[in-house]
C-alpha cells in the first residue's frame, strides 16, 4: 500500500514526515535540510525555484520571489489584511479573477493556492525520492483558527499539487498527537503554537490514545513575519534618521533588510546582542551608503512587546471556553519557531505559572503529528482517537439581522445540526439563506461565508412554511449547508465556496471584541427580538380585530386600534423597554377581543356538537335501512 505522507505547510517553512514502523520520521529534502523555506520564485529566464534555491536569490530578485503566501490564502483582495500586506512585501499582490488576493511573479497572475501547491509538490518529490515510489495521498496541517475559506483553499492547493488530501488537521492538534502518542496517563495540556504567520492556542485532554480538543483560539495574522517586519521598520527608521533616505521605497534594500531582520531575530534567541551590517544598502549623489547597527535583545523585545502580549487574550479565551484555570493545565507544549524567543517562553511561564515543555522540536512536531494522523487513516497506527473542534460559531441571518447560531464554537467535529425556520412575509415563495461565521449577536458584525436561495415555496401565511436548515461540518472543518422545505420536500444544498478569509480585524471583531461589545450586542439583540414579537402581535391583533371586531364595543375597538398604532411607532425606534411596554398595553387592550374570540369558538363548537348528535340519530335509521339493502345485494349476488 502506498504511503500517506504528513505535511506541515507553514508560512515561513514547511516540513514533511512519514510513519517509519511505529515512529513518525521527518524526511530531509534534496538540500539535506529537515525543513524547506515556503518560498517560490520565478528567475529571470522563467525557471521556477522552490525552497532554499528560491530563498538564496531573493535579494537579487525581490519582485518575483513569493514568501508568506499562506497569509493570503482564502482572503479577498479588498480585505484590510491584504492592504496591510501589500505595503510590506516587495512582490505584487493583485486582484484575482474571483476577487481574491492573488500574486504576480514572472509577469503571471497566480492564486495563493497555486503557489502553495508548488511548495507541496516539492514536499511530494522529497517523499518520493526517499521512498522510491509514487506518493498520491497526504494529511496537511492548517492553523486551528483557519476559517472555512482558508481550509478549502489549502485543500485546493493539495489537489493542484497532485495530492488527494485525506484530512486537513489543525496544527496544535497535530503537535499534541506527536507529543502524547506514548503518554498513557491522562493529562490536560495546552499547545501554544506561534509560527511564522499565525498563532493558535489549543487546550486538550490526552491519555491512553484519546486526544480530545476542549477549546481552541488564535489569531490568523500574528507570527514571526510580524516580528521581522517590526524590526525592518525600526532599521529603516534608524537609517532614515541618520541618512535621510527611506529604504522602504527600494524593493532590493527592503529584501536585504528583511533577511537581516530574520537573522538578527534568530541570533537574539541565544545571545543578548547582535550587529547588523549591510554594506552598500543604497546610494545617493554623495556615494554609497552602508547600514551598521548594534541591536540588543532588550531593544528587540521592546519593539515587539505588543505582539507578544497579543498572544495572551486568546490563551485566556481558550481556558475560559474549556472551563479551566491556568493552574489546571498539566503541561504547556511550545510549537513554532517563534517559541524559541526567550521573551515568549517567559510570558508563557508567567501566564500558566509553570515552565513550558521544550522536549519537542518546535519546527518538526506538527509534521510528525500529521504523519501519525496519516498512519491512523491508513490503519498503521492503532488505538488512537482524535476529537477536534470547530474554532468559530456557524449560523444564519434571521429576521431583523440577528445571527442565529446552529453550531457553537468549540463543538467537536464532525458534527451535524438542524433547525426549522419559517417565512417572514405572507405568500413568500423564496428564502435566501445567508451563512455567517463568528461570535457577535448581529449577523452583519460576523464574517459572511456565502448565501443561496430556496425557491418554490407554496404561498402561505407567514410563519406557516417549515424550512429546515442543516449545517454539516466534516472532519476537515469544511462546511456544507442545506435548506429543505418540509412541505414540498424541495432541497438546496451547497458547500460553502471560498469567499475570502478572515482578516485580522475580522477575527478581533468576532472573538476578542465579542466580550467588550457584549453589552451593546445584548441591547441590539433585545431590540430586534422585541421588534419581532411586536410585529407578530400587531399582525395577529389586526387579523383578530378584522374578524371579531363586531363582537366588542366601539370604545374597545378604538382602544385596540390606538394600541396597535402606538406599538407600530415604538417598533420603529430602538428602545426595547418601550416596545415591550407598548406590546403589553396592546395585549391588555386586546383581552376583551380574545374573550370574544373564545366565546365565538365555544359557540361554534357547541353548534358543531349539536349537529353531530343530530346526524348520529338519523344515521341509526339509515344504517338499518342500508344493512337490509346490503343483505339483499348479497342474496342477489348469491
UniProtKB/Swiss-Prot annotation:
The keyword Chaperone applies. The modification Phosphothreonine is found at residue 198. Transmembrane segments: none annotated. The keyword Cell inner membrane does not apply. Residues 598-638 are annotated as: Disordered. GO terms for molecular function: ATP binding; ATP-dependent protein folding chaperone; unfolded protein binding. Residues 620-632 have a biased composition (Acidic residues). Pfam families: HSP70. It comes from the Bacteria. Coiled coil: none annotated. Residues 601-619 have a biased composition (Basic and acidic residues). Keywords: ATP-binding, Chaperone, Nucleotide-binding, Phosphoprotein, Stress response. Induction: By stress conditions e.g. heat shock. InterPro entries: ATPase_NBD (IPR043129), Chaperone_DnaK (IPR012725), Heat_shock_70_CS (IPR018181), HSP70_C_sf (IPR029048), HSP70_peptide-bd_sf (IPR029047), Hsp_70_fam (IPR013126). Belongs to the heat shock protein 70 family. Acts as a chaperone. This is Chaperone protein DnaK. The lineage of its organism: Bacteria, Pseudomonadati, Pseudomonadota, Alphaproteobacteria, Hyphomicrobiales.
Amino acid at each position: 500500500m502506498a504511503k500517506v505522507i504528513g505535511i506541515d505547510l507553514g508560512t515561513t517553512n514547511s516540513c514533511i514526515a512519514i510513519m517509519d514502523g511505529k515512529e513518525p520520521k521527518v524526511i530531509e529534502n534534496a538540500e539535506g535540510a529537515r525543513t524547506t523555506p515556503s518560498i517560490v520564485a520565478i528567475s529571470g529566464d522563467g525557471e521556477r525555484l522552490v525552497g532554499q534555491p528560491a530563498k538564496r536569490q531573493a535579494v537579487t530578485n525581490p519582485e518575483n520571489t513569493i514568501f508568506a503566501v499562506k497569509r493570503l490564502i482564502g482572503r479577498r483582495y479588498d480585505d484590510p489584511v491584504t492592504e496591510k500586506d501589500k505595503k510590506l512585501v516587495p512582490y505584487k499582490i493583485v486582484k484575482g479573477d474571483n476577487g481574491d488576493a492573488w500574486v504576480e511573479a514572472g509577469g503571471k497572475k497566480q492564486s495563493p493556492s497555486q503557489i502553495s501547491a508548488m511548495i507541496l509538490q516539492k514536499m511530494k518529490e522529497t517523499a518520493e525520492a526517499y521512498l522510491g515510489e509514487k506518493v498520491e495521498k497526504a494529511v496537511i496541517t492548517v492553523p486551528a483558527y483557519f476559517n472555512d475559506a482558508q481550509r478549502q483553499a489549502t485543500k485546493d492547493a493539495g489537489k493542484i499539487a497532485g495530492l488527494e488530501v485525506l484530512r486537513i488537521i489543525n496544527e496544535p492538534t497535530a503537535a499534541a498527537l506527536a507529543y502524547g502518542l506514548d503518554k498513557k496517563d491522562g493529562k490536560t495540556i495546552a499547545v501554544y503554537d506561534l509560527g511564522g504567520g499565525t498563532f493558535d492556542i489549543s487546550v486538550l485532554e490526552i491519555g491512553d490514545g484519546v486526544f480530545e480538543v476542549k477549546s481552541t483560539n488564535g489569531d490568523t495574522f500574528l507570527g514571526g513575519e510580524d516580528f521581522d517586519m517590526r524590526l525592518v521598520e525600526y532599521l529603516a527608521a534608524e537609517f532614515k534618521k541618520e541618512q535621510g533616505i527611506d529604504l522602504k521605497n527600494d524593493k532590493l534594500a527592503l529584501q536585504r533588510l528583511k533577511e537581516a531582520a530574520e537573522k538578527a531575530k534568530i541570533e537574539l534567541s541565544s545571545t543578548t546582542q547582535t550587529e547588523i551590517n549591510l554594506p552598500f544598502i543604497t546610494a545617493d549623489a554623495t556615494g554609497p551608503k552602508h547600514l551598521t547597527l548594534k541591536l540588543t535583545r532588550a531593544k528587540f523585545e521592546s519593539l515587539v512587546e505588543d505582539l507578544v502580549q497579543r498572544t495572551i487574550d486568546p490563551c485566556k479565551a481558550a481556558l475560559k471556553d474549556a472551563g479551566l484555570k491556568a493552574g489546571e493545565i498539566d503541561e504547556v507544549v511550545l510549537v513554532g519557531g517563534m517559541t524559541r524567543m526567550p521573551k515568549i517562553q517567559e510570558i508563557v511561564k508567567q501566564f500558566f505559572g509553570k515552565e513550558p515543555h521544550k522536549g519537542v522540536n518546535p519546527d518538526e512536531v506538527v509534521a510528525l503529528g500529521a504523519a501519525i494522523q496519516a498512519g491512523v487513516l491508513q490503519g498503521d497506527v492503532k488505538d488512537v482517537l482524535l476529537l477536534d473542534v470547530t474554532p468559530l460559531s456557524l449560523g444564519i441571518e434571521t429576521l431583523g439581522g440577528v445571527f442565529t447560531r446552529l453550531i457553537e464554537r468549540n463543538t467537536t467535529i464532525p458534527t451535524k445540526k438542524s433547525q426549522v425556520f419559517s417565512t417572514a412575509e405572507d405568500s413568500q415563495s423564496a428564502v435566501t439563506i445567508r451563512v455567517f461565521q463568528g461570535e457577535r449577536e448581529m449577523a452583519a458584525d460576523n464574517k459572511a461565508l456565502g448565501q443561496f436561495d430556496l425557491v418554490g415555496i407554496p404561498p402561505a401565511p407567514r410563519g406557516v412554511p417549515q424550512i429546515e436548515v442543516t449545517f454539516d461540518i466534516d472532519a476537515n472543518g469544511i462546511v456544507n449547508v442545506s435548506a429543505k422545505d418540509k412541505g414540498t420536500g424541495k432541497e438546496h444544498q451547497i458547500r460553502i465556496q471560498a469567499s475570502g478569509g478572515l482578516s485580522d480585524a475580522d477575527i478581533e471583531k468576532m472573538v476578542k471584541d465579542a466580550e467588550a461589545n457584549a453589552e451593546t450586542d445584548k441591547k441590539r439583540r433585545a431590540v430586534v427580538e422585541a421588534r419581532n414579537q411586536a410585529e407578530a402581535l400587531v399582525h395577529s391583533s389586526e387579523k383578530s380585530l378584522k374578524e371579531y371586531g363586531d363582537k366588542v364595543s366601539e370604545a374597545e375597538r378604538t382602544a385596540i386600534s390606538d394600541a396597535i398604532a402606538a406599538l407600530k411607532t415604538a417598533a420603529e425606534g430602538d428602545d426595547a423597554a418601550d416596545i415591550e411596554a407598548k406590546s403589553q398595553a396592546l395585549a391588555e387592550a386586546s383581552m376583551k377581543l380574545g374573550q370574544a374570540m373564545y366565546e365565538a369558538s365555544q359557540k361554534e363548537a357547541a353548534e358543531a356538537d349539536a349537529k353531530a348528535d343530530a346526524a348520529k340519530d338519523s344515521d341509526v335509521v339509515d344504517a338499518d335501512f342500508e344493512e337490509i339493502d346490503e343483505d339483499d345485494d348479497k342474496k342477489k349476488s348469491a
